A protein has these predicted regions:
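Short cysteine-rich clusters marking metal-coordination/redox-active sites
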Residues: 50-53
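Short functional micro-motifs and their immediate structural scaffolds
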Residues: 58
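Beta-edge loop/turn motif
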Residues: 71-82
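Residues immediately within or flanking Cys/His clusters that coordinate Zn2+
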Residues: 47
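Sec-dependent signal peptide recognition
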Residues: 2-8
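C-terminal motif of bacterial Sec signal peptides marking the signal peptidase cleavage site
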Residues: 14-16
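Bacterial signal peptide processing site
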Residues: 18-20
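C-terminal partner/receptor-binding element of secreted or periplasmic proteins
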Residues: 132-166
Length: 166
């Protein structure tokens, strides 16, 4: 009996202590992509994580934004976290957003956003997805609802997330 218990504990420890060689991103979330599809623009050991909230940038890639401040390029999981950074009174330059069709970063000030679709948002109850082409934004809106807006209108909508935070 003693040998069986020791053997069982040893097997349990060996199985429980083995580590996977790679992280699996088998997410059914609309915002997610595979690590091979994601473009991470930050440098350093924490480049996979939102600079504001720490969320995984691959998992929330389709709502990812980036911007420059004092020669440092930051990447955010969402426009919510970009706005959170702006709330500190800093000036962010060259804002970019991921086009959910091409998965490439585009100029956020020229993007067509679909706000309030049936797809889940990131860091907000109101979803915000960006497109480089207005026709793509309209197709998405027709399938999933929402309204089309530009970057500045989306920033104003996002500011409401922080209304009760002070």
């Amino acid at each position: 009996m003693y040998k069986i218990m020791i053997s069982s504990i040893a097997i349990f420890l060996l199985v429980g202590c083995t580590s996977e060689k790679s992280i699996s991103y088998k997410s059914n979330m609309f915002q997610s992509v595979s690590p091979q599809e994601a473009v991470l623009v930050q440098k350093g050991e924490n480049k996979n994580f939102c600079v504001r909230c720490g969320m995984d940038l691959v998992k929330y890639y389709k709502t990812s934004h980036s911007a420059m401040h004092n020669d440092t390029l930051y990447q955010y999981c969402s426009i919510h976290c970009l706005q959170d950074h702006l709330n500190e009174g800093i000036v962010l330059k060259n804002p970019k957003v991921v086009d959910i069709d091409t998965l490439k970063f585009i100029d956020a000030t020229k993007a067509y956003y679909v706000v309030g679709s049936q797809k889940n948002g990131t860091m907000s109850m109101i979803s915000k997805y960006a497109f480089s082409k207005e026709a793509d934004a309209k197709d998405f809106r027709d399938k999933f609802g929402g309204e089309i807006a530009d970057f500045y209108k989306v920033l104003n909508i996002t500011k409401k997330d922080f209304k009760h935070r002070r």
